[in-house]
Amino acid sequence: MIIRVTLPTHLRTLAQVTGTITLDVPEPVTRQAILDSLESAYPMLRGTIRDSTSKERRPFIRFFACGEDLSHQPPESPLPGEVTSGIEPFRIIGAMAGG
């Protein structure tokens, strides 16, 4: 399935892309499948979004779809139909911290 993905600016710069990217993701479309496809298409992103060994989400990285934070859902959970149909993008957000 063709999935739209948005990346934070620093990762778009690293991947040398602008705007939303599209990926061909095998079914079932899950966060894990999207990240596997993303890292395959853009190898320079390996280890930036999730740990390259454990595949755990990196601190300060969040995942959103349809206005909902999916960061704490299991990586193999199916994504909303709006994402799998291409209506809504899967968003990878670089969280902010500080005081």
Set out the residue ranges of the language-model regions.
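Ubiquitin-like/PB1-type beta-grasp interaction modules and other compact soluble beta-rich domains
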Residues: 1-98
